[in-house]
Amino acid sequence: MKKMRKQTGFTLLEVMVVVVILGILASFVVPNLLGNKEKADQQKAVTDIVALENALDMYKLDNSVYPTTDQGLEALVTKPTNPEPRNYREGGYIKRLPKDPWGNDYQYLSPGDKGTIDVFTLGADGQEGGEGTGADIGNWNIQDFQ
């Protein structure tokens, strides 16, 4: 006697229904994830700017002045010359300069246009001004991005 085996598995129709349902779910989830990426990039910029500002404050505590605009943020990593700081810490104030979340260098002005010093990123567009992801984020407006 031959036994008949029952075949198990999914029909093509069942697989197609699952694919359609997954597509519908993805249409709701993906836009939310993209918005979170933009927010995460802005939060990283805020965190970096606060850390750079703290390192600059430590530099000023040791040397009585902030680095000049020409010396830039690089003065936090390697000892600047002309003018040479009086009490520069061995090893610097940070190990390396971070890039902003969009791969650009952070900007630094001393004296600043918005305060004693300005530390900022030009945002995703790399241009002054802008809105949304292209907005400039600086130590003068970080509260707007928290």
UniProtKB/Swiss-Prot annotation:
Is Repeat included in the keywords of this UniProt record? Answer: no
Where does the source fall among the domains of life?
Bacteria
Q: How is it modified after translation?
A: Cleaved by the prepilin peptidase.
Q: Which family does it belong to?
A: Belongs to the GSP G family.
| Organism from which the protein derives | Vibrio cholerae serotype O1 (strain ATCC 39315 / El Tor Inaba N16961)
Give compartment(s): Cell inner membrane
Supply the name of the protein.
Answer: Type II secretion system core protein G
The gene it comes from is epsG
Task: Give TM regions.
Answer: 10-30
Respond yes or no to whether keyword Cell inner membrane is given for this record: yes
List the induction conditions.
Answer: By cyclic di-GMP and VpsR.
Keyword terms of this UniProt record: Cell inner membrane, Cell membrane, Membrane, Methylation, Protein transport, Transmembrane, Transmembrane helix, Transport
User: Where in this protein does the record say N-methylphenylalanine is found?
Assistant: 10
The annotated subunit structure for this chain is: Type II secretion system is composed of four main components: the outer membrane complex, the inner membrane complex, the cytoplasmic secretion ATPase and the periplasm-spanning pseudopilus. Forms homomultimers. Interacts with EspL.
Q: Which Pfam families match?
A: N_methyl, T2SSG
For this entry, list what GO says about its biological process: protein secretion by the type II secretion system
User: Function, please?
Assistant: Core component of the type II secretion system required for the energy-dependent secretion of extracellular factors such as proteases and toxins from the periplasm. Pseudopilin (pilin-like) protein that polymerizes to form the pseudopilus. Further polymerization triggers pseudopilus growth.
Looking up InterPro entries in the UniProt record yields: Bac_GSPG_pilin, N_methyl_site, Pilin-like, T2SS_protein-GspG_C, T4P/T2SS_Core, Type2_sec_GspG
